């Protein structure tokens, strides 16, 4: 049987705040490698995206004021390394995401593939 005396008890918001502090203090800046599987631009300008690998997904956001510093535009199917901070949000549903500061193409092969795809697209339009 579980001994309730030694188990901490929290209010929901109290637990969410504790969770936020643990996550955000232990994962200050991180680099996450994954494929972009979804991209949405909000009316206020921020970009919401989803990164995935074989087993998991992670939400990410690029705030409007940081978009001008990006070297590449996020596109579905692009394999990237996103650098940023892990943050939590618990207004209606507790979630965590990466607040992205920088995006890099993951590997030389992915970069060459991107260049080749763009070249073909421009050739179809007779611009290359």
Regions found by a protein language model. Give the residues of each.
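Acidic, two-metal ion nucleic-acid-processing modules in DNA metabolism proteins
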Residues: 1-128
């Amino acid at each position: 049987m579980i001994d309730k005396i030694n188990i901490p008890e929290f209010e929901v918001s109290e637990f969410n705040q504790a969770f936020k502090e643990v996550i955000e203090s232990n994962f200050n800046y991180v680099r996450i490698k994954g494929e972009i599987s979804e991209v949405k631009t909000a009316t206020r300008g921020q970009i919401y995206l989803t990164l995935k690998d074989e087993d998991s997904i992670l939400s990410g956001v690029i705030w409007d004021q940081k978009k001008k510093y990006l070297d590449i535009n996020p596109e579905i199917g692009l394999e990237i390394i996103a650098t940023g901070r892990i943050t939590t949000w618990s207004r209606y549903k507790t979630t965590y995401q990466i607040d992205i500061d920088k995006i890099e193409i993951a590997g030389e092969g992915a970069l060459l593939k991107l260049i080749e795809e763009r070249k073909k697209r421009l050739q179809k339009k007779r611009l290359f």
